[in-house]
Design a protein with these regions (language model features):
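Short hydrophobic helices that act as membrane-entry/anchoring signals
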Residues: 3-18, 75, 79-82
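A general boundary/transition motif marking the beginning of the first structured unit of a protein
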Residues: 1-2, 39
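Soluble catalytic domains of membrane acyltransferases
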Residues: 20-147
Length: 147
């Protein structure tokens, strides 16, 4: 419920800043009953937001660098939006186990950026491992930012 409220509030804010977003080929997105992993290049902090909007009413979890949780208010906000912290310097097994459990046992899907950051072109292998262990599909996504 709170996730839905936050998504609506953020959609209103982004609409007032950037105008109406246009989504194409949303018919390719799996049904609401199926969990999956959305993957895309990570260019801006808007990325997971627009990806979640394109697939509503589906709810998601997101990996986010642990430093984003240092600010208590912002950390609370993104946690309520489905983010969970990842230590990119010393990743633990929970970075893989947590999303696998969520994908298997809840109605939430996962949004991931295989490069791991906005400033990297290297593709990490976590997406394939999580998808294989959770037995879910990987859905590649691309987008153009508002102009």
């Amino acid at each position: 419920m709170f996730y839905t409220y936050l998504r609506g509030l953020v959609m209103l804010i982004l609409w007032s800043i950037n105008g109406n977003a246009h989504y194409h080929n949303t018919d390719k997105i799996p049904s609401r009953d199926e969990n999956y992993i959305l993957v895309a290049p990570h260019r801006t902090w808007w990325d997971p937001v627009y990806m979640a909007f394109a697939t509503k009413p589906k709810q998601f979890i997101f990996m986010a660098k642990k430093e984003l949780f240092n600010n208590r208010i912002f950390g609370w906000w993104i946690r309520m939006c489905g983010a969970f912290p990842i230590d990119r310097e010393k990743p633990s097994a929970s970075a893989i186990k947590y999303p696998i459990n969520v994908l298997k046992k809840s109605d939430r899907s996962l949004i991931m950026f295989p490069s791991g950051s906005r400033h990297s072109n290297d593709v990490k292998g976590g997406v394939a491992l999580i998808a294989k262990m959770a037995k879910v599909r990987i859905m590649p996504v691309t987008y153009n930012l508002p102009s």
